[in-house]
Protein backbone atom coordinates (compact mmCIF):
# COMPACT_ATOMS: atom_id res chain seq x y z
CA UNK A 1 0.00 0.00 0.00
CA UNK A 2 1.48 3.31 -1.09
CA UNK A 3 0.57 6.62 0.52
CA UNK A 4 0.97 9.97 -1.21
CA UNK A 5 2.35 13.11 0.40
CA UNK A 6 1.92 16.73 -0.57
CA UNK A 7 3.21 17.78 -3.98
CA UNK A 8 6.03 20.35 -3.99
CA UNK A 9 5.34 24.05 -4.48
CA UNK A 10 5.95 25.43 -8.01
CA UNK A 11 9.43 26.59 -8.91
CA UNK A 12 9.92 30.34 -9.51
CA UNK A 13 8.66 31.04 -13.03
CA UNK A 14 11.59 33.20 -14.10
CA UNK A 15 14.09 30.60 -12.88
CA UNK A 16 12.32 27.94 -14.97
CA UNK A 17 12.22 30.24 -18.00
CA UNK A 18 15.94 31.05 -17.72
CA UNK A 19 16.87 27.37 -17.36
CA UNK A 20 14.86 26.49 -20.47
CA UNK A 21 16.46 29.38 -22.37
CA UNK A 22 19.77 27.55 -22.01
CA UNK A 23 18.33 24.51 -23.78
CA UNK A 24 18.30 23.77 -27.51
CA UNK A 25 15.26 25.11 -29.37
CA UNK A 26 13.95 22.23 -31.48
CA UNK A 27 10.99 24.10 -32.92
CA UNK A 28 8.05 26.43 -32.37
CA UNK A 29 4.35 25.77 -32.85
CA UNK A 30 1.79 27.88 -34.67
CA UNK A 31 0.10 28.75 -31.37
CA UNK A 32 3.19 30.18 -29.72
CA UNK A 33 4.66 27.23 -27.84
CA UNK A 34 8.34 26.30 -27.87
CA UNK A 35 9.76 22.77 -28.09
CA UNK A 36 13.04 22.66 -26.17
CA UNK A 37 15.71 19.99 -25.60
CA UNK A 38 16.90 20.30 -22.00
CA UNK A 39 20.16 18.78 -20.82
CA UNK A 40 20.40 17.67 -17.19
CA UNK A 41 22.08 19.97 -14.68
CA UNK A 42 22.31 19.77 -10.86
CA UNK A 43 19.37 21.44 -9.11
CA UNK A 44 17.98 22.70 -12.43
CA UNK A 45 14.76 24.66 -11.71
CA UNK A 46 13.18 23.50 -14.97
CA UNK A 47 13.86 19.85 -14.16
CA UNK A 48 12.52 20.28 -10.63
CA UNK A 49 9.34 21.80 -12.09
CA UNK A 50 9.08 18.92 -14.57
CA UNK A 51 9.34 16.50 -11.65
CA UNK A 52 6.61 18.36 -9.77
CA UNK A 53 4.29 18.40 -12.78
CA UNK A 54 4.95 14.75 -13.56
CA UNK A 55 3.85 13.79 -10.06
CA UNK A 56 0.79 16.03 -10.26
CA UNK A 57 -0.23 14.64 -13.65
CA UNK A 58 0.44 10.97 -12.94
CA UNK A 59 -1.53 11.10 -9.70
CA UNK A 60 -4.55 12.28 -11.69
CA UNK A 61 -4.54 8.93 -13.51
CA UNK A 62 -3.80 6.71 -10.52
CA UNK A 63 -0.02 6.55 -10.92
CA UNK A 64 2.88 8.56 -9.49
CA UNK A 65 5.58 7.94 -6.90
CA UNK A 66 3.74 9.39 -3.91
CA UNK A 67 6.62 11.83 -3.40
CA UNK A 68 6.80 15.61 -3.64
CA UNK A 69 8.27 15.33 -7.13
CA UNK A 70 8.64 12.49 -9.61
CA UNK A 71 12.41 12.63 -10.06
CA UNK A 72 14.84 9.72 -9.94
CA UNK A 73 18.53 8.97 -10.45
CA UNK A 74 18.05 8.58 -14.20
CA UNK A 75 17.00 12.21 -14.62
CA UNK A 76 20.60 13.17 -13.90
CA UNK A 77 21.87 11.69 -17.18
CA UNK A 78 18.77 11.66 -19.40
CA UNK A 79 17.65 14.54 -21.62
CA UNK A 80 14.18 16.06 -21.74
CA UNK A 81 12.02 17.35 -24.58
CA UNK A 82 9.94 20.11 -23.03
CA UNK A 83 6.88 21.92 -24.39
CA UNK A 84 6.86 25.49 -23.03
CA UNK A 85 3.95 27.92 -23.26
CA UNK A 86 5.78 31.23 -23.55
CA UNK A 87 2.58 33.25 -23.10
CA UNK A 88 1.31 31.48 -19.97
CA UNK A 89 4.91 30.90 -18.75
CA UNK A 90 3.99 27.27 -18.12
CA UNK A 91 5.60 23.88 -18.75
CA UNK A 92 2.90 22.12 -20.77
CA UNK A 93 4.50 18.68 -20.89
CA UNK A 94 7.70 16.76 -21.40
CA UNK A 95 9.23 13.51 -22.63
CA UNK A 96 12.33 11.95 -21.09
CA UNK A 97 14.82 10.36 -23.44
CA UNK A 98 18.15 8.64 -23.16
CA UNK A 99 20.65 7.80 -25.90
CA UNK A 100 21.28 4.21 -24.93
CA UNK A 101 24.70 3.80 -26.56
CA UNK A 102 26.47 6.52 -24.56
CA UNK A 103 24.55 5.52 -21.41
CA UNK A 104 25.72 1.91 -21.76
CA UNK A 105 29.31 3.07 -22.26
CA UNK A 106 29.18 5.21 -19.13
CA UNK A 107 26.99 3.23 -16.73
CA UNK A 108 26.32 -0.17 -18.28
CA UNK A 109 22.78 -1.58 -18.31
CA UNK A 110 22.22 -0.14 -14.82
CA UNK A 111 22.13 3.31 -16.42
CA UNK A 112 18.92 2.52 -18.32
CA UNK A 113 15.60 3.10 -16.57
CA UNK A 114 14.10 0.13 -18.45
CA UNK A 115 16.68 -2.15 -16.84
CA UNK A 116 15.29 -1.33 -13.39
CA UNK A 117 11.98 -2.90 -14.47
CA UNK A 118 13.11 -5.52 -17.01
CA UNK A 119 16.09 -7.83 -17.22
CA UNK A 120 17.70 -7.75 -20.67
CA UNK A 121 19.41 -10.74 -22.24
CA UNK A 122 22.99 -10.07 -23.41
CA UNK A 123 21.76 -10.22 -27.02
CA UNK A 124 19.59 -7.16 -26.40
CA UNK A 125 22.62 -4.88 -26.15
CA UNK A 126 22.93 -4.91 -29.95
CA UNK A 127 19.60 -3.16 -30.47
CA UNK A 128 19.92 -1.04 -27.33
CA UNK A 129 23.09 0.59 -28.66
CA UNK A 130 21.18 1.77 -31.73
CA UNK A 131 18.24 3.02 -29.69
CA UNK A 132 16.79 5.88 -27.71
CA UNK A 133 14.77 5.14 -24.59
CA UNK A 134 11.58 7.17 -24.22
CA UNK A 135 9.47 7.49 -21.10
CA UNK A 136 7.92 9.58 -18.33
CA UNK A 137 5.84 11.48 -20.90
CA UNK A 138 3.11 13.77 -19.61
CA UNK A 139 0.89 16.70 -20.53
CA UNK A 140 -0.47 18.71 -17.58
CA UNK A 141 -4.25 18.39 -17.07
CA UNK A 142 -4.97 22.00 -18.10
CA UNK A 143 -3.78 21.13 -21.63
CA UNK A 144 -5.46 17.73 -22.01
CA UNK A 145 -7.41 17.52 -25.24
CA UNK A 146 -5.03 19.89 -27.03
CA UNK A 147 -2.34 19.08 -29.60
CA UNK A 148 0.34 19.08 -26.91
CA UNK A 149 1.30 15.40 -27.17
CA UNK A 150 1.64 15.75 -30.94
CA UNK A 151 3.90 18.77 -30.39
CA UNK A 152 6.13 16.66 -28.14
CA UNK A 153 6.30 14.07 -30.92
CA UNK A 154 7.35 16.82 -33.31
CA UNK A 155 10.19 17.44 -30.87
CA UNK A 156 11.12 13.76 -30.93
CA UNK A 157 11.07 13.94 -34.73
CA UNK A 158 13.43 16.92 -34.71
CA UNK A 159 15.71 15.06 -32.31
CA UNK A 160 15.76 11.99 -34.57
CA UNK A 161 16.27 14.10 -37.69
CA UNK A 162 19.56 15.31 -36.21
CA UNK A 163 20.52 11.70 -35.33
CA UNK A 164 19.71 9.62 -38.42
CA UNK A 165 21.69 6.61 -37.15
CA UNK A 166 19.02 5.94 -34.50
CA UNK A 167 17.26 2.68 -35.40
CA UNK A 168 15.03 1.95 -32.41
CA UNK A 169 12.76 3.66 -29.91
CA UNK A 170 12.08 1.68 -26.76
CA UNK A 171 10.82 2.07 -23.22
CA UNK A 172 8.06 1.22 -20.77
CA UNK A 173 4.49 2.31 -21.56
CA UNK A 174 2.14 2.22 -18.60
CA UNK A 175 -1.39 1.09 -17.85
CA UNK A 176 -2.83 2.69 -14.71
CA UNK A 177 -3.68 0.53 -11.70
CA UNK A 178 -6.96 2.48 -11.63
CA UNK A 179 -7.97 0.66 -14.82
CA UNK A 180 -10.18 -2.40 -14.17
CA UNK A 181 -8.15 -5.59 -13.97
CA UNK A 182 -10.16 -7.13 -16.79
CA UNK A 183 -9.33 -4.21 -19.08
CA UNK A 184 -5.62 -4.50 -18.33
CA UNK A 185 -5.79 -8.25 -18.98
CA UNK A 186 -7.40 -7.73 -22.39
CA UNK A 187 -4.93 -4.99 -23.35
CA UNK A 188 -1.89 -7.01 -22.31
CA UNK A 189 -3.13 -10.16 -24.04
CA UNK A 190 -3.84 -8.31 -27.29
CA UNK A 191 -0.40 -6.71 -27.46
CA UNK A 192 1.38 -9.91 -26.46
CA UNK A 193 -0.53 -11.85 -29.11
CA UNK A 194 -0.14 -9.50 -32.08
CA UNK A 195 3.20 -7.85 -31.29
CA UNK A 196 5.25 -10.54 -29.55
CA UNK A 197 9.01 -10.73 -29.22
CA UNK A 198 10.08 -14.15 -30.56
CA UNK A 199 13.65 -13.49 -29.40
CA UNK A 200 12.57 -13.00 -25.76
CA UNK A 201 15.13 -10.22 -25.28
CA UNK A 202 13.75 -8.99 -21.95
CA UNK A 203 11.80 -10.31 -18.99
CA UNK A 204 9.92 -8.29 -16.39
CA UNK A 205 11.41 -8.37 -12.91
CA UNK A 206 7.86 -8.40 -11.53
CA UNK A 207 5.83 -10.13 -14.27
CA UNK A 208 2.21 -9.26 -14.99
CA UNK A 209 -0.04 -12.30 -14.93
CA UNK A 210 -3.35 -12.43 -16.79
CA UNK A 211 -6.28 -14.10 -15.05
CA UNK A 212 -7.10 -17.58 -16.42
CA UNK A 213 -10.63 -16.69 -17.55
CA UNK A 214 -9.52 -13.81 -19.77
CA UNK A 215 -6.44 -15.75 -20.88
CA UNK A 216 -8.67 -18.36 -22.50
CA UNK A 217 -11.38 -15.93 -23.65
CA UNK A 218 -8.88 -13.61 -25.33
CA UNK A 219 -7.05 -16.46 -27.05
CA UNK A 220 -10.36 -17.63 -28.50
CA UNK A 221 -11.33 -14.09 -29.53
CA UNK A 222 -8.20 -13.47 -31.63
CA UNK A 223 -8.43 -16.83 -33.42
CA UNK A 224 -8.51 -16.22 -37.17
CA UNK A 225 -8.28 -12.43 -36.82
CA UNK A 226 -5.47 -10.22 -38.05
CA UNK A 227 -4.23 -7.31 -35.93
CA UNK A 228 -6.76 -4.85 -37.36
CA UNK A 229 -9.75 -7.12 -36.79
CA UNK A 230 -8.36 -8.06 -33.40
CA UNK A 231 -8.17 -4.38 -32.51
CA UNK A 232 -11.87 -3.97 -33.30
CA UNK A 233 -12.65 -6.93 -31.05
CA UNK A 234 -10.46 -5.48 -28.30
CA UNK A 235 -12.29 -2.16 -28.48
CA UNK A 236 -15.61 -3.98 -28.08
CA UNK A 237 -14.37 -5.71 -24.94
CA UNK A 238 -13.00 -2.47 -23.49
CA UNK A 239 -16.20 -0.57 -24.30
CA UNK A 240 -18.11 -2.94 -22.02
CA UNK A 241 -15.74 -1.86 -19.26
CA UNK A 242 -15.96 1.86 -20.14
CA UNK A 243 -12.26 1.91 -21.01
CA UNK A 244 -10.45 3.21 -24.09
CA UNK A 245 -7.05 2.10 -25.37
CA UNK A 246 -4.44 4.41 -23.79
CA UNK A 247 -3.21 7.10 -26.17
CA UNK A 248 0.46 6.09 -26.10
CA UNK A 249 -0.35 2.45 -26.88
CA UNK A 250 -2.28 3.59 -29.95
CA UNK A 251 0.39 6.10 -30.93
CA UNK A 252 3.38 3.74 -30.76
CA UNK A 253 1.66 0.91 -32.59
CA UNK A 254 0.38 3.29 -35.28
CA UNK A 255 3.91 4.48 -36.09
CA UNK A 256 4.67 1.35 -38.12
CA UNK A 257 2.94 -1.04 -40.49
CA UNK A 258 0.93 -3.48 -38.33
CA UNK A 259 2.24 -6.81 -39.59
CA UNK A 260 5.85 -6.00 -40.44
CA UNK A 261 7.36 -6.68 -37.02
CA UNK A 262 8.16 -3.01 -36.63
CA UNK A 263 6.71 -2.91 -33.12
CA UNK A 264 7.23 -5.51 -30.42
CA UNK A 265 6.19 -5.73 -26.79
CA UNK A 266 9.10 -7.47 -25.10
CA UNK A 267 7.23 -8.14 -21.84
CA UNK A 268 4.78 -6.71 -19.29
CA UNK A 269 5.46 -6.13 -15.61
CA UNK A 270 4.08 -4.41 -12.51
CA UNK A 271 5.88 -1.39 -11.01
CA UNK A 272 5.10 -1.24 -7.27
CA UNK A 273 7.08 2.00 -6.88
CA UNK A 274 4.82 3.80 -9.37
CA UNK A 275 1.30 3.18 -8.16
CA UNK A 276 1.38 -0.51 -9.17
CA UNK A 277 0.92 0.46 -12.79
CA UNK A 278 1.52 -2.14 -15.50
CA UNK A 279 4.43 -1.40 -17.83
CA UNK A 280 4.70 -2.82 -21.32
CA UNK A 281 8.27 -2.69 -22.64
CA UNK A 282 7.91 -1.63 -26.27
CA UNK A 283 10.45 -1.58 -29.08
CA UNK A 284 9.75 0.32 -32.31
CA UNK A 285 11.97 -0.30 -35.34
CA UNK A 286 12.19 3.01 -37.21
CA UNK A 287 13.13 1.11 -40.35
CA UNK A 288 9.43 0.17 -40.59
CA UNK A 289 8.11 3.67 -39.93
CA UNK A 290 5.02 4.44 -42.01
CA UNK A 291 5.81 6.95 -44.79
CA UNK A 292 3.08 9.29 -43.54
CA UNK A 293 4.56 9.29 -40.03
CA UNK A 294 8.07 9.87 -41.35
CA UNK A 295 6.80 12.79 -43.42
CA UNK A 296 4.91 14.26 -40.46
CA UNK A 297 7.59 14.03 -37.80
CA UNK A 298 11.02 13.57 -39.41
CA UNK A 299 11.28 14.38 -43.14
CA UNK A 300 9.69 17.81 -42.97
CA UNK A 301 11.28 19.02 -46.20
Q: Where are the regions that the model predicts?
A:
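Conserved N-terminal entry element of GNAT/NAT acetyltransferase domains
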Residues: 2-41
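Short catalytic/ligand-binding loop motif for oxyanion handling, primarily in non-cytosolic enzymes
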Residues: 91, 177-181, 274, 291-292
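Aromatic sugar-binding interfaces of carbohydrate-active proteins
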Residues: 247-254, 263-281
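C-terminal non-catalytic accessory extensions
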Residues: 275-301
Amino acid sequence: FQTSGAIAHPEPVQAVRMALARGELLGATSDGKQIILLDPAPECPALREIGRLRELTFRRVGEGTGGRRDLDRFDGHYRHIVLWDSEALQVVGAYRLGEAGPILDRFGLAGLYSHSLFEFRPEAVEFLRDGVELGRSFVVPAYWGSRSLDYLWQGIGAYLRARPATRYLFGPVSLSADMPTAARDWLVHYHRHYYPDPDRLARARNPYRIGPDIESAAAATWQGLDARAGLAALKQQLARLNVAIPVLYRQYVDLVEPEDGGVRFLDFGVDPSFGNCVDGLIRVDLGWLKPAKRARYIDLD
